UniProtKB/Swiss-Prot annotation:
EC number(s) reported in the record: 2.3.1.129
Catalytic activity line of the entry: a (3R)-hydroxyacyl-[ACP] + UDP-N-acetyl-alpha-D-glucosamine = a UDP-3-O-[(3R)-3-hydroxyacyl]-N-acetyl-alpha-D-glucosamine + holo-[ACP]
Protein name according to UniProt: Acyl-[acyl-carrier-protein]--UDP-N-acetylglucosamine O-acyltransferase
Superkingdom of this protein's organism: Bacteria
EC category: transferase
Originating species: Pseudomonas entomophila (strain L48)
Gene: lpxA
Pathway: Glycolipid biosynthesis; lipid IV(A) biosynthesis; lipid IV(A) from (3R)-3-hydroxytetradecanoyl-[acyl-carrier-protein] and UDP-N-acetyl-alpha-D-glucosamine: step 1/6
Length: 258
């Protein structure tokens, strides 16, 4: 059974599943759907079209599904879609998409979005990601599974952050970050691979050694991207995990962080 505080404002067209909780002074607008077991704290604003999955927790003063400030936006009915088991901490802002891109901002499952972070329009966040306090993603940003963006990380529009990547505090990212890579600084510079995070996720020493070799091929041998891709082919044949690194470089439209 849902638990709706009498001081909350729920639009009649909103759809709330069983077990949803909505705290005082929160507003759930039209064309919002909230899945089973999701908890909406006090002073939260949810604006549609927005679909929120199961067992999420959204803390106070967050604004989810607001119109994008993109000046091309003219009120089209774009979407925000959030998966399951996400934690959205205090003061987070997540905007809906634009018709110039996917018309949708997407958040996967099991993500932690910490206080005052911002996710811009048309961005795509994978699963098991962490955006630490005050991290800000511009529009059209893609963040791969298990990526961690430390506090005050800034990401330029259209950048792609690869799976398992890591950014240090205050990093300003203007180019794509390949999978597994750790970046620091303003502007961002590649420092290593996220070996500590990979160990915690069960990557074997043999695979870590292969990824270290892959990193050196791309970042330490003075090769062009095309030359590095050819050298990585041999490693990919032995270690499928290297393919994720290789593909994130090969598919980069903005160029990779060096």
């Amino acid at each position: 059974m849902s638990s709706i505080d009498p001081r909350a404002i729920i639009d009649p067209s909103a759809k709330l599943a069983e077990g949803v909780e909505v705290g005082p002074w929160s507003i759930v607008g039209p064309d919002v759907e909230i899945g089973e077991g999701t908890v909406i704290g006090p002073h939260v604003v949810l604006k549609g079209p927005t679909r929120i999955g199961k067992h999420n927790r959204i803390y106070q003063f967050s604004s989810i599904g607001e119109d994008t400030p993109d000046m091309k936006y003219k009120g089209e009915p774009t979407r925000l879609v959030m998966g399951d088991h996400n934690v959205i901490r205090e003061g987070v802002t997540i905007h809906r998409g634009t018709i110039q891109d996917r018309s949708e901002t997407t958040l996967g499952d099991h993500n932690l979005i910490m206080a005052y972070a911002h996710i811009g329009h048309d961005s795509v966040i994978g699963n098991h990601c962490i955006l630490v306090n005050n991290t800000a993603l511009a529009g059209h940003v893609h963040v791969g599974d298990w990526a961690i963006l430390s506090g005050y990380t800034l990401v330029h529009q259209y950048c792609h952050i690869g799976a398992h990547a890591f950014s240090g505090m205050g990093t300003a990212i203007g180019k794509d970050v390949p999978a597994y890579v750790t970046v620091f600084g303003s502007p961002a510079e590649a420092r290593s691979m996220n070996f500590e995070g990979l160990r915690r996720r069960g990557f074997s020493d043999e695979v870590l050694h292969a990824l270290r070799r892959a990193y050196k091929i791309v970042y330490r041998q003075g090769l062009t991207v095309e030359q590095a891709m050819k050298e990585l082919d041999e490693l990919v044949a032995q270690f499928p995990e290297v393919e994720l690194f290789r593909q994130s470089i090969a598919n980069s439209a903005r160029g990779i962080t060096r």
